[in-house]
UniProtKB/Swiss-Prot annotation:
Disulfide bonds: none annotated. It comes from Human herpesvirus 2 (strain HG52) (HHV-2). Keywords: Activator, Host cell membrane, Host membrane, Membrane, Transcription, Transcription regulation, Virion, Virion tegument. GO terms for cellular component: host cell plasma membrane; membrane; viral tegument. Residues 510-522 have a biased composition (Pro residues). InterPro entries: Herpes_UL46 (IPR005051). Belongs to the herpesviridae HHV-1 VP11/12 protein family. Interacts with VP16. Interacts with host LCK, PIK3R1, SHC1 AND GRB2; these interactions promote the activation of the PI3K/AKT pathway. Interacts with host YWHAB. Interacts with ICP0; this interaction targets UL46 for degradation by the proteasome. This is Tegument protein UL46. The lineage of its organism: Viruses, Duplodnaviria, Heunggongvirae, Peploviricota, Herviviricetes. It is a peripheral membrane protein.
C-alpha cells in the first residue's frame, strides 16, 4: 500500500506557490491583491540593509578569524561600557602566531618592493650617499666627508619597508667580534617579534562599538602613543651615537667632537621614566599589564642594541664605517616602521576612543616626535602618510566602516560621541588649515588671513556708506545725552580685557559689553571719561558706527583706524582720531599713566590670546560662530523706553551659523533665527538706556555667545592643565 508523504497534499502545495492570505477568505484570488502582495520592488530600507550587509561581509573577509568569531562577540556582549578585557586581547595574540593580522599590508609592501628591485650593493651605496648628505647638514665643516657618488637610484622605499619585512639584513655582522655579531642578530630578531606582538595587541584591543567611548581603550591608546615618543627619543640617540663614531673616524685625531644635536638623555633613563610615569604606570589600572609587558620587551631589546653600539668593537678602515652606517639605518628603519604602524592605525580609526580624540596630547607628542626625527635625519627616513598606509593595510579602515554603518542606518544620524569627533575633524587644526611650517610671524600672518571675517550681508535700508558718516557728524553736534541712573540700566561697561574673538584690523567692529566690569572705585569720573565711554554707559549700543575713516580724513588720522575696538575707550577726550597735537599732549598728561599700559592679562588670569603680531596686535582665538557686523540704525521707542512691536532684537551683532558646526538641532548649535521687521526711518535723537533683556533666555543671543565663550575657555584650560 502506497503511503502519501506528509505535506504533499494539493492544498499544501498551493500554499507553497501562492501566499496563504490569498487562498483563505472570501476575496481569494483577486488580481489586485495578488499584484500588490507580490510586488518585490526594492525599498530604500532594504537597499541600505543590503549595502550594510555587503560592507560587513567584505570587512569580515579581511579580518583574522578570531576578530570575527562568535566567542569574541559573546564575551564582548557580556561587558559593560564598551570595554575589552585584556584576557581577550591576549587570546587574540595567541590565535595569530603567523601574523595574519598584517597579511594584506605585507603583501602590498612586498609587491611594491618587487616593482623597484635593488641589489644589496646598490641599496648600500644609495644609503651611504644619503647619509653623507645628512652628515653635511649636521657637521658643515671640520670633516673630510667623502664625495657624493652618482646616485643611480632612490632607496627610500627599500629603507622604509625592507628591514621589517625581509628576514635577511644587508649587514649581518657589523662588529669585529663574533659574539657581538651574534648578539646583534639575536637582538634584531627579538626586536622584530616584540614589535609584532605590540602591533597585534593594538589590532585586537578594539571594542565592538566605535560610536561609543571606551575608558580602558583610551588608556591603552595613550600608553601606546607615549611609547612612540620614547621610540623616537631612542632613535635620535642611536643616530647621534653613530654620527659620533663616524666623526671620530673621519676627523682629526686631536679634535674632540661634542654632541651634534645637543645633550641627549641615556636610553636607560628614558625607558625607566616612561615605565614609572607613563599613562599606564600612574593610573594603577590592571587592564594594561600585558601591554606593559609587551612594551618592556621592546625596550629591553633596544637597550641591548644601544649597549652594543656604545661598547662594540668595529672593523677598521672603510668597511667598518660602511657597516656602522648601514646597520644603524636598518635598525632605525625597523623602529621607525613600528612607530608608524601605531600612529597610522590611530589616525585610521582608533582615534575615536582616544581622550580628546584628535586633540589628544599623546597623539600630538607622538606625531611631533616623528616629525622632528625625520626632519633632523632627512633624507634618510621617509614617512608614509595615513591614507597611503590605509590603502595597503585594508582591514582596519574597512572594519570601522562596517561597524559604524549599522548604527547610522538605525538612527539616521551619528551618535553624539562620534558626531563630536566629526565636528572636530571638519573644523581643521587650531591654527587653520594652512598654518603649517614657517616662522612664528608667518603662522600669525596665515592665521589672520585664514580667519578673515566673511563679507557683510546685503545692505539694510538707510545704511549707505555715506549715511553713517552724516549721522555721526550730526550726532557730534547734539548735546550730550542725559545721564541715566544706575538703577535704570544694566551693569555699566568698562575698559576690560579684549574679547575672545578675532578682530579684523582693517575696520573696528562695534564693541561688545565687557565681561568683567571694574569696581566703582577704579572707574574714572563721568566727566573725565571720553565721549565713547559715556555713550556706552548711557546704554546707546545701537548707534550707527563707521567702518573706516572719513573720505576727507588726513593720512595721519587714518592710521588710527587700525586700533583695536577698546583702544578708543581707553584714551581720554582729545586723544586719538581728530585730535590736535596740543590737545593730544594735554589730555594724555592728565590721564592716569596706568591707562596707557599694555592690556596684558595678569599671571593668574586665564590666557585668552593665541599669539602676538609684529605690530603688537592680538590675534584672538575663534569661537564656533561667525559674527557678521552691520551698521545698525537707531530705532524708535515708545514712552518708557519700550521698543516698537516687531522691532529687531537688542543685539549689536548678528549670530550667523557656521556651516562647519551645523550638525545638530540643539539650541547651542542651531539658534532660533529672529525675524527682522523693516527698519523705521532714520532718527537722530539720543536713545535712552537699552534694557538688558533676553540675557538669560536659553536661546537668547547673549546667552549663546556666553556659552560659546565658556566652552572655548574650558577647552583651552583643559589643554593647559595636561
Amino acid at each position: 500500500m502506497q503511503r502519501r508523504a506528509r505535506g504533499a497534499s494539493s492544498l499544501r502545495l498551493a500554499r507553497c506557490l501562492t501566499p496563504a492570505n490569498l487562498i483563505r477568505g472570501a476575496n481569494a484570488g483577486v488580481p489586485e491583491r495578488r499584484i500588490f502582495a507580490g510586488c518585490l520592488l526594492p525599498t530604500p530600507e532594504g537597499l541600505l540593509s543590503a549595502a550594510v550587509g555587503v560592507l560587513r561581509q567584505r570587512a569580515d573577509d579581511l579580518q583574522p578569524a578570531f576578530l570575527t568569531g562568535a566567542d569574541r562577540s559573546v564575551r564582548l556582549a557580556a561587558r559593560h561600557h564598551n570595554t575589552v578585557p585584556e584576557s581577550l586581547i591576549v587570546d587574540g595574540l595567541a590565535s595569530d602566531p603567523h601574523y595574519d593580522y598584517i597579511r594584506h599590508y605585507a603583501s602590498a609592501a612586498k609587491q611594491a618592493l618587487g616593482e623597484v628591485e635593488l641589489s644589496g650593493g646598490q641599496l648600500s651605496r644609495a644609503i651611504l650617499a644619503q647619509y653623507w648628505k645628512y652628515l653635511q647638514t649636521v657637521v658643515p665643516s671640520g670633516l673630510d666627508i667623502p664625495d657624493d657618488p652618482a646616485g643611480d637610484c632612490d632607496p627610500s622605499l627599500h629603507v622604509l619597508l625592507r628591514p621589517t619585512l625581509l628576514p635577511k639584513l644587508l649587514v649581518r655582522a657589523p662588529f669585529k667580534s663574533g659574539a657581538a655579531a651574534a648578539k646583534y642578530a639575536a637582538a634584531v630578531a627579538g626586536l622584530r617579534d616584540a614589535a609584532h606582538r605590540l602591533q597585534q595587541y593594538m589590532f585586537f584591543m578594539r571594542p565592538a562599538d566605535p560610536s561609543r567611548p571606551s575608558t580602558d581603550t583610551a588608556l591603552r591608546l595613550s600608553e601606546l602613543l607615549a611609547y612612540v615618543s620614547v621610540l623616537y627619543h631612542w632613535a635620535s640617540w642611536m643616530l647621534w651615537t653613530a654620527d659620533k663614531y663616524v666623526c671620530r673616524r673621519l676627523g682629526p685625531a686631536d679634535r674632540r667632537f661634542v654632541a651634534l644635536s645637543g645633550s641627549l638623555e641615556a636610553p636607560a633613563e628614558t625607558f625607566a621614566r616612561h615605565l614609572d610615569r607613563g599613562p599606564s604606570g600612574t593610573t594603577g589600572s590592571m587592564q594594561c599589564m600585558a601591554l606593559r609587558a609587551a612594551v618592556s620587551d621592546v625596550l629591553g631589546h633596544l637597550t641591548r642594541l644601544a649597549h652594543l653600539w656604545e661598547t662594540g668593537k668595529r672593523s677598521g678602515g672603510t668597511y667598518g664605517i660602511v657597516d656602522a652606517i648601514v646597520s644603524t639605518v636598518e635598525v632605525l628603519s625597523i623602529v621607525h616602521h613600528h612607530a608608524q604602524y601605531i600612529i597610522n592605525a590611530t589616525l585610521t580609526g582608533y582615534v575615536v576612543w582616544a581622550s580628546d580624540s584628535l586633540n589628544n596630547e599623546y597623539l600630538t607628542a607622538a606625531v611631533d616626535s616623528q616629525e622632528r626625527f625625520c626632519r633632523t635625519a632627512a633624507p634618510l627616513f621617509p614617512t608614509m602618510t595615513a591614507p597611503s598606509w590605509a590603502r595597503m593595510e585594508l582591514s582596519i579602515k574597512s572594519w570601522f566602516g562596517a561597524a559604524l554603518a549599522p548604527d547610522l542606518l538605525r538612527s539616521g544620524t551619528p551618535s553624539p560621541h562620534y558626531e563630536s569627533i566629526l565636528r572636530l575633524a571638519a573644523s581643521g587644526p587650531p591654527g587653520g588649515r594652512g598654518a603649517v611650517g614657517g616662522s612664528c610671524r608667518d603662522k600669525i600672518q596665515r592665521t589672520r588671513r585664514d580667519n578673515a571675517p566673511p563679507p557683510l550681508p546685503r545692505a539694510r535700508p538707510h545704511s549707505t556708506p555715506a549715511a553713517p558718516r552724516r549721522c555721526r557728524r550730526h550726532r557730534e553736534d547734539l548735546p550730550e545725552p542725559p545721564h541715566v541712573d544706575a538703577a535704570d540700566r544694566g551693569p555699566e561697561p568698562c575698559a576690560g580685557r579684549p574679547a575672545t574673538y578675532y578682530t579684523h584690523m582693517a575696520g573696528a567692529p562695534p564693541r561688545l559689553p565687557p565681561r568683567n566690569p571694574a569696581p566703582p572705585e577704579q572707574r574714572p569720573a563721568a566727566a573725565a571719561r571720553p565721549l565713547a565711554a559715556q555713550r556706552e554707559a548711557a546704554g546707546v549700543y545701537d548707534a550707527v558706527r563707521t567702518w573706516g575713516p572719513d573720505a576727507e580724513a588726513e593720512p595721519d588720522q587714518m592710521e588710527n583706524t587700525y586700533l583695536l575696538p577698546d583702544d578708543d575707550a581707553a584714551m581720554p577726550a582729545g586723544v586719538g582720531l581728530g585730535a590736535t597735537p596740543a590737545a593730544d599732549t594735554t589730555a594724555a598728561a592728565a590721564w592716569p599713566a596706568e591707562s596707557h599700559a599694555p592690556r596684558a592679562p595678569s599671571e593668574d588670569a586665564d590666557s585668552i590670546y593665541e599669539s602676538v603680531g609684529e605690530d603688537g596686535g592680538r590675534v584672538y582665538e575663534e569661537i564656533p560662530w561667525v559674527r557678521v557686523y552691520e551698521n545698525i540704525c537707531p530705532r524708535r521707542r515708545l514712552a518708557g523706553g519700550a521698543a516698537l512691536p516687531g522691532d529687531a532684537p537688542d543685539s549689536p551683532y548678528i549670530e550667523a551659523e557656521n556651516p562647519l558646526y551645523d550638525w545638530g538641532g540643539s539650541a547651542l548649535f542651531s539658534p532660533r533665527r529672529a525675524t527682522r521687521a523693516p527698519d523705521p526711518g532714520l532718527s537722530l535723537s539720543p536713545m535712552p538706556a537699552r534694557p538688558r533683556t533676553n540675557a538669560l533666555a536659553n536661546d537668547g543671543p547673549t546667552n549663546v555667545a556666553a556659552l560659546s565663550a565658556l566652552l572655548t575657555k574650558l577647552k583651552r584650560g583643559r589643554h593647559q592643565s595636561h
